[in-house]
Amino acid sequence: MECPEGQLPISSENDSTPTVSTSEVTSQQEPQILVDRGSETTYESSADIAGDEGTQIPADEDTQTDADSSAQAAAQAPENFQEGKDMSESQDEVPDEVENQFILRLPLEHACTVRNLARSQSVKMKDKLKIDLLPDGRHAVVEVEDVPLAAKLVDLPCVIESLRTLDKKTFYKTADISQMLVCTADGDIHLSPEEPAASTDPNIVRKKERGREEKCVWKHGITPPLKNVRKKRFRKTQKKVPDVKEMEKSSFTEYIESPDVENEVKRLLRSDAEAVSTRWEVIAEDGTKEIESQGSIPGFLISSGMSSHKQGHTSSEYDMLREMFSDSRSNNDDDEDEDDEDEDEDEDEDEDEDKEEEEEDCSEEYLERQLQAEFIESGQYRANEGTSSIVMEIQKQIEKKEKKLHKIQNKAQRQKDLIMKVENLTLKNHFQSVLEQLELQEKQKNEKLISLQEQLQRFLKK
């Protein structure tokens, strides 16, 4: 395996395990990572070393002598000059290959050592930093000044562009980095990972390969803002239901994120618009039937060639209805279980509220009977020993009545707002009937509240 040319960069001081990349190159030296047949990787300096003024110095005298002799031979044979030029141009036209690079992340103390080696431009760097890749291609042994470190090649959740510069003004892109070699000081670094026993079952082989790939997946980026970026940004894809019957049995909200739902809704609305008469129902989340209507609806008596404006209006009306009756589902895939728990809690709260209302009604009836008996015993509403306790009970009941009255008024206000927004006549009639019931309840609560206040005033006067 051959790794690209590049010098290890200076990593951030704030990172506990600073990142040392092989993708950046300074203007002084270009170290290269080479792998021999024994899978041992060493760093070797390139033949040409760029100086401060941009001049190139040959690696040795033999190379310079060969270049001079070739130039003299070309001068003595001018008839072969054009042919040699054409051959050199054809060789120069070979497209540049994209380099394969990865990021080297080391512990803090070893990262400082490698950084100093890179800055010193020492020729002995190849003896002080070695990378030995294991046959599986995912594990390696990194030696920093004869200190072995266990390393693992992981896949990054994002692609990082590698740039190279010679004058620190102009940058050239050399590669896209998507892997990182993470080194740790602890771990078994001498033994290669054990190969599992070969199996003929393709399913078992596929599962094992998937398990190996998941172990080599890095869930974080290389900067602090990209912590857990794979979990936050890459959501699980929605599974497509193959059976249509199962899809009909399931609720609409379970597949609200499916891409085919929007097209299905448009098709249903289009078929309703083209129909002469329609029958439709509005069902709440708890499964109870709210509205049932049959017959022709003036708002939906549109010809088959209706305009896109009408279609958009119908779909927007459907979205409004869905928003009113079934609140939009949360988009966080990681909190699906929490959403189910919230729904169960809401149902439990509704049941608790119903029970509380029943208990309050029973307590109110009991209090009224007790007050009537007290009035009969006292004759002309004279106070006795139990008068103070009855006054306290009356005050509690008045507070409860006021709270319930406030809730009913809020519900009535919401119904009025819905009536103002909805354009469908049938829905308006339904909301109007609900509003009338709420107004009737409000009137009854007001009467009971006034009665309790009068009784309280009588007890306080006595």
UniProtKB/Swiss-Prot annotation:
Annotated tissue distribution: Testis-specific.
Location within or outside the cell: Nucleus; Cytoplasm
Primary localization: nucleus
Matches recorded under SMART domains: TAFII55_N
GO biological process, any: RNA polymerase II preinitiation complex assembly
Keywords, in A-Z order: Coiled coil, Cytoplasm, Developmental protein, Differentiation, Nucleus, Spermatogenesis, Transcription, Transcription regulation
Cited InterPro entries: TAF7, TAFII55_prot_cons_reg
Subunit text: TFIID is composed of TATA binding protein (TBP) and a number of TBP-associated factors (TAFs). TAF7L may replace TAF7 in a spermatogenesis-specific form of TFIID. Interacts with TBP; the interaction occurs in a sub-population of cells (pachytene and haploid round spermatids) and is developmentally regulated through differential intracellular localization of the two proteins. Interacts with TAF1.
PANTHER family in alphabetical order: TRANSCRIPTION INITIATION FACTOR TFIID 55 KD SUBUNIT-RELATED (PTHR12228), TRANSCRIPTION INITIATION FACTOR TFIID SUBUNIT 7-LIKE (PTHR12228:SF8)
Described function: Probably functions as a spermatogenesis-specific component of the DNA-binding general transcription factor complex TFIID, a multimeric protein complex that plays a central role in mediating promoter responses to various activators and repressors. May play a role in spermatogenesis.
Name listed for the protein in its UniProt record: Transcription initiation factor TFIID subunit 7-like
